[in-house]
Each structure stands twice: as structure tokens, then as C-alpha cells.
Amino acid sequence: MSNMQSPPPEVLFADELAFLETWDAGTRPKGFRMTASSVVTFLMGSRGEALKRPKSAGKKASGPESLVISPKFVGSRALVERSVITLAGERGLLLVGEPGTAKSMISELLAAAISGTSALTVQGTAGTTEDQLRYGWNYALLLAKGPHPEAIVPSPVLTAMRSGRVARIEEVTRCLPEVQDALVSILSDRRLSVPELSGSDPHIEHAGLGFNVIATANLRDRGVSEMSAALKRRFNFETVPPIASAREETALVKARATRMLERAEAELKVDDAVLEAIVTVFRDLRLGRTEEGYAVEKPSTVMSTAEAVSVAASIGMSAAFLPSDRDVLGLVPGYLAGVVTKDDPKDRGRLLAYWDGVVKKRAEGKQRLWQTLHELRAQLEE
């Protein structure tokens, strides 16, 4: 794990997953490695309480007798519960929302908790082919022996069907409509026909118990294809909203930025007040209104929590690897300008208007941090 830039959840939280598999002896949905309530606990955490392993787990259960489960998703518990129940049935789960609202993270966590792996993944792009959702061929074996089962190269979806696990399809709406529709028969019939192997009897791959699909899609993104009505009917839709609480968003940004710096063997030396200011700016520009009630012109860029984490981590990296007497607050305008203007250069004007309005008003209110930020306005024009 030490050599991984971004360990998957089944590696990062291996101790928690192993503990939860034996913590609850209740009924498990077919194919689940733990109970549905344990899956919810894995995502939402145990609220700081140390869960105790029951005596009924027996001596075969290894690991600690009690464990605090860390919260991984900051959001609606009801959304997580509905998602888990969807996956316990025979309908796919489609997570939709603005970019950066943790849809991919939720799908990873759910797949890891339910199936033990989040690796059975297809990344949707305009170049994704039907083979990547169904199967391909080992052409050396195909030429040597002709069509036979050993020559099939299964897609992550077919691998999940065979093993009764959860497959993930990221940004499904980036796939072309004809490619998306390859999922219709898989999700409705729970089987996949391989006509190349069909002789007198058809060759059909049947989905094992526990198989399901989690797909994600961005609501505000360019270069996407509309899903067919037939495919939409095969999914239960869950909309993942941005984090409602500024305090919770700040805590999440700090935790994620800290984790990123730990992987770089560095320490996050950014004051909580600076992190709060970063999150406040992101929320103001994302929502189009400040907590004080001031109207703000929203940029075309989605000011997501993921982008806020990136800015906080970049400032932390700069402080760790380019140490100087300069206040890290002086780095904030430059990184903000990079985020705001990446989709439309005209958004720089909107950021400057925010500085001349909201930031100036806060500075006039004798808030020292905002006074310093207002004095750094010139950096936004560079």
C-alpha cells in the first residue's frame, strides 16, 4: 500500500471491512459480504463509538474485538440506505449529480463493502466500445483454435456477472448511446448471450447471485450522450447533492487534504481559518449567494468540494516543499483563479467582482483574514 498513490477502499479500509463482516450476524442479501446495515455503517461511520464484536463471531474472527468505523461520506444517510437496498435487489443504481460530489467515491465504497473489490470498473468515454461492457477475444487463441470459451476476454461487467459481484461504470453518459444500450439486456435479463460460441445450443453467460451495476453520471458536463428511456428504466436514480453544511465541508476538505499530504510524507501546515476561507469562497461561488445574503454571480465552472480539496492540498504542498516566510494565505488567490477560469476565461471577471463586492465588505467588517485577501486582489489579474 505504501507505493500506491491512491489505494482503493478495500486496501485503505481493510481492517474495517474485515471487522464489519463478522460484527453483525443478521441476514445478508445474496452475494453481500456483510449485512446491509453494516454496509451503511461502513460509509457513514459509527459516530465515534467503538463497535464491539459479538461473542457469536467465534474464534475464527481475527482482528480487534472493538473498532471505531470512520465516516467516509458526508451526506444523507437515507441516500446511502436507499442505494444499498437497490443493490440488494435486481435493479442497477445510477448516481447522478454535479461534478465533484463524491459519486465515484460512493460507488467505490459500496462495491468494496458488498463485493470486496471496487476494481471491476469501466471508465466511460466517447471511445468506449461495446466490447468493454460485454467481452472481447484473445485473437491468438481465436486464430489457433477458433471461437471457444477460453478465447473470451471478459469485460469487468462479465467478470462481475460470473462471480456475483458489483461492477462499476463511471460516467456512463460519456459512452455513445449504442454502447450504453449494451447494458439493457444485461440489466433486464441478467444474462449475456455469446452468439460466436452458439452451436446447436445457445451459449449464455448467467449472472451469479449478488451481481449488480453501479453507474455514475454528471448533470453539468460537456460531451455527454442522452440515456435511452429503456436504459433509464433499468436503474434506480439517486441524486448526490453538494454538502449542505459549511462546517462539515471544511472538516472533509481538511481530512482529505491531510491524507493527500500524508501520502507525500508531508504535514498539512495550513490554519483552520485559511481552510474555512477557501471553503467559504467555494460555497459562495457555487451557490450564488453568501451566508450574509449577498448575491454572487456564479462562474461556469462547478466549484466542487473535490476542487476545494485540491486547492487546500496544493497550498499544503507548497508550504511543505517550498518553505518560506510568506503567509500561505497569499497562495489562495492564485489557486482560486486557476480553478475558476479553467472553463471560461471570462469567469475571471466574475471572480474579480466577487473580490470587489463580498471580500471587500468582509474586509470592511474588520475581519483580518478577509482584509489580507482583499489586499491580494492584484494576483487575480496576473
Q: What is each of the regions a protein language model found here?
A:
Residues T35, T129, V153, R168, ...:
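A diffuse structural propensity rather than consistent per-protein peaks
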